[in-house]
Amino acid sequence: REPSGNSNGLTLNRTGRLLACEHGNRRVSIADIGGTEETFVDAYEGKKLNSPNDVVVHSSDAVYFTDPPYGIKPEQMEQPCAGVYRVDPDGAIRCVIADFEKPNGLAFSPDESVLYIDDSHHQHIRAFDVAADGSLNNGRMFADLSDDGDGVPDGMKVDQEGNLYATNALGIWVYNPAGDFLGLISVPEVPANCAWGEDGR
């Protein structure tokens, strides 16, 4: 649709509706297959979000998204941090992580026991255990990319084997579930995200 509100991260929820992180509109929108859309979330504790960047949906229907300040000027920032948020099925919104500088891509492990989140400012990827109540615990370094000059992590996806694919200016980094670097997939352009087809490719 046009205008798109500078949409970035996209994903489908469990009923096939499209969630879109709209930088320009400072919100996450939700749309049905016919194109009818509405605001899913645009504020936390009465203050506007920064500029939502990427979004994932848990099998419980909880929605997690990152909210860096990329799409706004510093003086427009109303939130006290660049947070990672969870919207529960009942509509309650919670800030689950508040110590990132610029949270960007995020992806679940195949069994949803781990949520990976990257910080483009610090050039690293962290892993968090996902508790039964949806909270994130035991945050730890998964991959430190700060030695790779232009290697700023962006959108991420996890395959069926649990390997993590992180896009960046150099291509697509691939890591196994233990955080070991497996290799770089070179591409002709600068990828901002990636996705899987029905055949797993």
Question: Where would I find each of the regions flagged by the language model?
Answer:
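Short loop/turn segments immediately following beta-strands, especially the blade-tip
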Residues: 127-135
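Residue-level detector of beta-propeller blades
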Residues: 92-95, 138-141, 181
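Anionic-ligand-binding alpha/beta catalytic cores of soluble enzymes and soluble regulatory domains
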Residues: 116-118
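A short loop-to-beta-strand structural motif that recurs across blades of beta-propeller domains
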Residues: 27-29, 82-85, 124-126, 171-173
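Short coil turn/linker residues within repeat-based beta-strand modules
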Residues: 34-36, 89-91, 122, 132, ...
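Beta-rich, blade/repeat-based domains predominating
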Residues: 2-22, 27, 45-65, 78-83, ...
